[in-house]
Design a protein with these regions (language model features):
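S-adenosyl-L-methionine
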Residues: 1-28
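A conserved structural/catalytic subdomain of Rossmann-like adenosyl-cofactor enzymes
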Residues: 19-223
Length: 223
């Protein structure tokens, strides 16, 4: 991917291995920026390796991601290596926003500790190999406010061939919403941690951003 984007080999350090069980960057400094699209709902060893619950990446949440769904294990891994003033943007399978049990406990840890800066709902059919409408979770450690921005960007795309694509204009509108951090009817909502708690730590964008009613209004009297 680096070579395809013409990034000189001297500017990156790539390691081959299992990120979750054999991380290759233990000796590195925390990262100021992390961008990731980890595999969706892949399997991992999870609780079968009892040592992992004491791993400094996963221990703070008090629970491991399910063996059948490693999504939030990757999220915790990245949070661990995020600098105090850094930002992480992670493309996630939508289930991580609402599934219960261990994943619900990890979401609670992330929200209660004010790490979740924004959740962005993306359009469906953006990525090769899946038509799923994924989302982006934006994490920060040093945040001045205690609220989460929810952005519905599900319509921010154009159809090209058999896939949807984010144009430069689509990307800029999404970035502007995140940077301005204000409520916009049917598009963005700024939600307090208390309100998220009352909603059982659900982070689905549709739970907080009401879609616009585009149905045609019919005057019964005129009919």
């Amino acid at each position: 991917n680096m070579f395809l984007h013409d990034v000189n080999f001297s500017n990156f350090d790539i390691a081959l291995g299992d990120t979750l069980t054999e991380p290759a960057h233990w000796d590195d400094q925390p990262f100021d920026a992390i961008v990731s699209n980890p595999p969706y709902s892949t399997k991992w060893v999870g609780k079968d390796d009892i040592a992992l619950i004491n791993d400094p990446r996963f221990a703070p949440a008090g629970v491991l991601a399910p063996k059948s769904k490693a999504d939030l294990a990757f999220t915790m891994h990245m949070l661990h290596w995020l600098a105090e003033d850094g930002t992480a943007a992670i493309v996630e399978f939508p289930g991580v926003l609402y599934r219960g049990a261990a994943e619900g406990k990890i979401r609670r840890y992330l929200v209660e500790n004010n790490f979740v800066h924004a959740v962005i709902q993306l359009p469906p059919d953006l990525f090769f190999g899946t038509t799923i409408a994924t989302c982006i979770i934006v994490l920060k450690k040093a945040r001045p406010d205690h609220s989460v921005l929810f952005v519905d960007a599900s319509a921010e795309c154009v159809r090209e061939g058999n896939k949807n694509r984010l144009t430069a204009e689509n990307q800029q509108r999404i970035l502007s919403l995140v940077s301005e951090r204000q409520a916009v009817d049917h598009v963005a909502a700024l939600v307090s941690i208390d309100d998220i708690k009352d909603n059982d730590w659900n982070l689905s964008v549709s739970s907080y951003v009401e879609p616009e009613d585009t149905r045609e209004q019919v005057d019964i009297v005129e009919l």
